[in-house]
């Protein structure tokens, strides 16, 4: 009987939803990155962008780079740029001197600690997370918080997901009574309808409680017909 029922199942038409509305749905196509993340070399620490070859300094601070507000100039020898976590690393810089190991007086920067261990220190390289064209999510995946975040970072504002099936729940039996009704020894409370609806809660489907149907073929046929 189960095999016959499953053989009648078919995929519902796909739909396009905003990413915020697609939570809990299932992807119908792969998510392929439209952008690279990070899109540029970024600082992993607060501090100063420098050229490692200039160690141990001193340097002259010539500007500032913050997230969303980058330094557009070129860093040259013995120069430094104040930088914050997530900011673009200026052209010409190859290391970050963290602020805990630096001293600054006006525009003069000096080394007060060990300094970066080598060129490339404290820099998140372009494409560390993923590159444009990478397949990040596979069709058939259920969209939870993590995949939703990945899709957004990959450049998606909408996603193609499966349609929402309608699930009708029927409680059948002459012995069933609605929850809370007084029960004698010949009857029991009908718990399955509400229990099954609770189990389906959170899945991408619409549930309809069709109530209790007596053990009568005509009534059952009518109930099933009303679900179509």
Model-derived features: where do they sit?
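Short, intrinsically disordered, charge-balanced linker/junction segments flanking boundaries
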Residues: 227-228
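Short beta->alpha junction loops
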Residues: 209-217
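Short, low-complexity N-terminal leaders and the immediately following helix N-cap/first helix
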Residues: 1-56, 107, 125
């Amino acid at each position: 009987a189960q095999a016959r029922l499953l053989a009648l199942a078919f995929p519902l038409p796909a739909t396009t939803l905003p990413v915020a509305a697609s939570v809990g749905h299932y992807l119908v196509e792969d998510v392929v990155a439209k952008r690279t993340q990070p899109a540029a070399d970024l600082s992993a620490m607060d501090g100063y962008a420098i050229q490692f070859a200039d160690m141990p300094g001193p340097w002259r601070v010539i500007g500032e780079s913050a997230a969303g507000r980058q330094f557009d100039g070129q860093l040259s020898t013995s120069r430094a740029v104040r930088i914050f976590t997530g900011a673009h690393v200026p052209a010409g810089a190859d290391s970050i001197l963290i602020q805990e190991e630096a001293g600054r007086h006006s525009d003069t920067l000096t080394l007060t600690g060990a300094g970066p261990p080598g060129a490339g220190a404290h820099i998140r390289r372009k494409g560390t997370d993923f590159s444009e064209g990478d397949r990040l999510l596979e069709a058939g995946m259920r969209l939870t918080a993590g995949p939703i975040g990945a899709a957004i970072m990959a450049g998606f504002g909408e996603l193609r997901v499966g349609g929402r099936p309608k699930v009708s729940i029927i409680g059948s039996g002459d012995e069933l009574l609605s929850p809370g009704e007084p029960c004698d020894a010949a009857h029991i409370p009908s718990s399955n309808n509400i229990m099954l609806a609770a189990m389906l809660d959170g899945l991408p489907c619409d549930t309809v409680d069709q109530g209790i149907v007596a053990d009568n073929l005509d009534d059952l046929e009518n109930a099933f017909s009303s679900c179509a």
